[in-house]
Amino acid sequence: MFCVAPPELETKMNITKGGLVLFSANSNSSCMELSKKIAERLGVEMGKVQVYQEPNRETRVQIQESVRGKDVFIIQTVSKDVNTTIMELLIMVYACKTSCAKSIIGVIPYFPYSKQCKMRKRGSIVSKLLASMMCKAGLTHLITMDLHQKEIQGFFNIPVDNLRASPFLLQYIQEEIPDYRNAVIVAKSPASAKRAQSFAERLRLGIAVIHGEAQDAESDLVDGRHSPPMVRSVAAIHPSLEIPMLIPKEKPPITVVGDVGGRIAIIVDDIIDDVDSFLAAAETLKERGAYKIFVMATHGLLSSDAPRLIEESAIDEVVVTNTIPHEIQKLQCPKIKTVDISMILSEAIRRIHNGESMSYLFRNIGLDD
């Protein structure tokens, strides 16, 4: 015999099952800053949680309020210690899972290890490993922004919303660069030409592509595995069969395809980390007659001596979003400017919580964007 709950009780249960909890998974103050901006836009309080490290360097997470039956959104930005950042996220996700959260959505504006999404030599595809770990920990949905390769979405067996920062960067160009009509969009390597083309078509501007030895090493898709010569044996290949080999690559001297003389050059990319290739591109553009040089990217990792090198370079301004904390780098280099993207993250959270369509956030976005 089955027991059916009265309709009025069913309604009450559905209401009590609702509720949104917003956590910051990082003890870093910069992550808290982004989390608070999102919370203010949503009109909710930050969830109560303690994230800290024990004296033995183990990460401990203590959730201090009930998450049972609630939609939990965990915001995590990548700090300097990326591995600790990942452990904080995984432990918090698992804690919410074991506390019977209805759904656990990770808000990770910059997906760590995204550069390691291809097989290199005898290495591994680390971003695939990280995706598997997140799913295993209990993540049910992921919100991220401008994945280094869109194919990373396929590493997950949960829904992934890969938001775009380009509308905010395009708005910055139109509002903060008065004579942007006299600009040309520049791809610092052929690998980033599609992104540059997307910016150029939307701003109705020309495009230039830098090609040559300053090209980003990551675009070199050589597999790189080398083995010792095969020992001659009965099982060895027949001497009359010669397998054709690829001709070794030789990068030409650096060249600019397109006219930048007397114009503003705006270099666009998704990540700015090691700045050597950007500096080489800026020097080349200056030599070709560009009178002002901007660099625009979604994720400003700005590792090592990047702020100092930018400050001493021909680059006039570097514009990045706040997907990654970079307050210290801004103090070291006044040329670095920040665009706030908390608005789109807040709207994504609101829509997912309310069960609304996400298509509004992907308007006019093509396959190449």
Swiss-Prot record:
Stretches that traverse the bilayer: none
InterPro entries per the UniProt record, alphabetical: Pribosyltran_N (IPR029099), PRibTrfase_dom (IPR000836), PRTase-like (IPR029057), Rib-P_diPkinase (IPR005946)
Modified residues (Phosphoserine): S219, S227, S233
Positions bearing N-acetylmethionine: M1
GO BP terms, alphabetized: 5-phosphoribose 1-diphosphate biosynthetic process; bone development; purine nucleotide biosynthetic process
Matching SMART domains: Pribosyltran_N
Gene Ontology CC annotation, any one: ribose phosphate diphosphokinase complex
Superkingdom, taxonomy of origin: Eukaryota
GO MF assignments: enzyme regulator activity; identical protein binding; magnesium ion binding
Matching Pfam families: Pribosyl_synth, Pribosyltran_N
Tissue specificity as recorded in UniProt: Ubiquitous.
Keywords in alphabetical order: Acetylation, Nucleotide biosynthesis, Phosphoprotein
Subunit structure: Binds to PRPS1 and PRPS2.
Family label: Belongs to the ribose-phosphate pyrophosphokinase family.
Role description: Seems to play a negative regulatory role in 5-phosphoribose 1-diphosphate synthesis.
Full protein name: Phosphoribosyl pyrophosphate synthase-associated protein 2
Protein source organism: Rattus norvegicus (Rat)
Origin organism lineage: Eukaryota, Metazoa, Chordata, Craniata, Vertebrata
Gene: Prpsap2
